[in-house]
């Protein structure tokens, strides 16, 4: 189940342009600036993405500051309490800022190469109007300039564990109001996301292209990046003790919480993304018979301004008799056949056959590690 909110239609990095577009459409029926407009949804899409692997930068920062502390200690210089953590965070932010600029440079080069191709390279896309805005005399750049050029990220949760020893999924509530309180992890998470948002807004204004913050689904990268990370840094508790990195800014799939709590946490970060994000909750098969509960969740996500929301339900199919339900084991409860069960799961937004054959080992393990977000205290 998906839901996209019209309220999220404008680009939060260009609110002024959005307002001018509304005024322009009212006055003369045309957009003030369609490149910066989130009003136009059809006939454009994501042109080229680059993903920054955040935990690698965090480890680089941690190792650098640990080395500096060791040298200072050898010289008899004491650091103030908390100085190591503060210095590590600051150096990480420097590395991240540099990497965001490198991503921008690579994306500009890719965009120039992509738009140098003739329309004949994808005739259907341009001459049939699939990509809007195409002007024959101007080439395919006339159409692709309306799409997004995005800087993505992977492993925010693991990055926070490296930097401060906790992620943003910690739930702390006010004892009187029961409201979710700001945690150390969420505070740093917002600082990191703000840097992405600020830089992409600057790049938009400078290059007149739709640079945006992208919460990468990492179908393959979650696994390949973790393999390289482990090879260099080994197994670190709460960081590399799984076979995958957590997608973008998601709460780790193994953390127990209610669906409402997951929405509460992730809704604080979705607004930093102007080029794609998703929040999902995992329910058991009984939710199929409780539409009232499903509707309550959808309404809650809308109230929290989640732009793209999914509810994941297990859907197992016996290939022998066609029985469909949540089948926990390898034996079909209807016909008794063993080992002929296909398991359909949503993985990074896709429903693509049996997840055990359609995705790599890391995504398979991530899917199996997912906890059900029950509506009771975790």
Stretch-by-stretch model annotation:
Residues 1-145, 166, 172-178, 182, ...:
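Conserved catalytic cores of very large enzyme subunits
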Residues 161-162, 363-366:
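Metallocofactor- and cofactor-centric catalytic cores in central/energy metabolism, strongly enriched
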């Amino acid at each position: 189940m998906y839901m996209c909110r019209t309220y999220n239609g404008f680009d939060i990095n260009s609110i002024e342009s959005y307002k001018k577009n509304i005024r322009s459409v009212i006055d003369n029926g045309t957009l003030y600036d369609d490149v910066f407009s989130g009003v136009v949804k059809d006939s454009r899409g994501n042109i080229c993405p680059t993903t920054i692997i955040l935990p690698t930068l965090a480890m680089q920062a941690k190792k650098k500051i640990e080395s500096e502390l060791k040298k200072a200690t050898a010289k008899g210089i004491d650091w103030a309490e908390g100085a190591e953590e503060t210095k590590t965070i600051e150096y990480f932010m420097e590395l991240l800022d540099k990497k965001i600029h490198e991503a921008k440079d690579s994306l500009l080069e890719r965009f120039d190469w992509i738009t140098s191709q003739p329309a004949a390279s994808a005739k259907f896309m341009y001459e049939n109007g699939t990509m809007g805005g195409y002007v024959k005399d101007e080439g395919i750049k006339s159409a692709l300039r309306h799409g997004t050029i995005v800087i993505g990220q992977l492993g925010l949760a693991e990055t926070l564990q490296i930097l401060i020893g906790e992620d943003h999924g910690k739930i702390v509530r006010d004892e009187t109001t029961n409201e979710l309180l700001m945690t150390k992890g969420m505070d740093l998470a917002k600082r990191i996301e703000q840097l992405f948002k600020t830089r992409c807004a600057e790049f938009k204004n400078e290059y007149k292209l739709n640079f945006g913050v992208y919460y990468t689904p990492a179908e393959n990268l979650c696994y390949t990046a973790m393999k390289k990370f482990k090879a260099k840094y080994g197994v670190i508790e709460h960081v590399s003790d799984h076979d995958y990195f957590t997608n973008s800014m998601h709460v780790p799939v193994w953390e127990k919480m209610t669906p409402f709590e997951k929405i509460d946490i992730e809704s604080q970060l979705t607004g930093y993304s102007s080029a794609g994000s998703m929040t999902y909750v995992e329910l058991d098969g009984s939710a199929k018979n409780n539409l009232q509960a499903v509707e309550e969740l959808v309404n809650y996500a809308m109230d929290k301004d989640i732009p793209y929301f999914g509810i994941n339900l297990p859907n197992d199919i016996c290939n022998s008799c066609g029985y469909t339900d949540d089948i926990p084991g390898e034996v079909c409860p209807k016909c008794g056949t063993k080992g002929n069960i296909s398991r359909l799961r949503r993985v990074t937004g896709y429903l693509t056959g049996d997840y055990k054959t359609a995705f790599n080992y890391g995504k398979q393990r991530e899917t199996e590690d997912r906890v059900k977000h029950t509506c009771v205290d975790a």
